Amino acid sequence: MPSSMVINTNIASLNSQKFLSRTNDSLHASMERLSSGLRVNSAKDDAAGLAIADRMTSQIRGMTVAMRNANDGISMAQTAEAGMGTVTETLQRMRDLAVQAANFAAVSGSDRDKLNAEFKQLGLELGRIIRNTEFNGKKILNGSLVGANFQVGPNTASDNQISVTVSDLAKVQSLSALFGTKLSIGGGTNSVSVRLAISAIDTAIGKVDIFRSNLGAIQNRFVTTIANLQSSVENQSAARSRIIDADFAAETANLSRSQILQQAGTAMLAQANQANQGVLRLLQ
């Protein structure tokens, strides 16, 4: 049945307006995505995708902060190990003095007193190092660092933390004997006393080496944790990108298509609006 010629309702114009509105929406969406670089700019673009991407963002940012925390752990362990390294160097110097003092055949009592003066000062310095070595205001060699938890994951689970304890060097008996010092290599001592000093120093060096090994193991654990976090951040970022980032090739094609449809729709709307002009000719 042929269409009637009416003037109150222009169906062709209404259809053209409807499709032109859709084209404009698509054009604006493509322009927004290309300008922002995001496929999902608001919940209306992809509500489920936005929710998933937000959860991934929380995990990615949490893991990024966790990497910084793990690096803090490495820095703390390095500081503690450096302090222990100084302790070891001091002990080695004290051992040199004791071995020299043990040479009773060539070293006089007054010479041993001079050696002992340095020996005692070094013993006092050992105590000062242990009492005052700190990281970010926290003492780390005097037993204060017990069960220090480093947050190395994005969540609250206990396995997202690494607990670090640094032994109290002051409680190591052989070290304590050197503070002040209870051992002596001076002129009033005999060879037995000097040998005891050497033995105590050797024991102390061995124990400090054990503590340093433990700190090295802690550092390696932090390094492994950081490597795992880096891989997780990379993979989660890639997954998030697939959900939320714009595909520039596809969006450029959509933009071109929408621009052509907009031009065509505008032309067709103009023609549809002119169609009713034929009614005027009938009335002439």
Segments from the language model and where they lie:
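Primary detection of the long, small/polar-rich alpha-helical "axial" segments characteristic
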Residues: M1-Q284
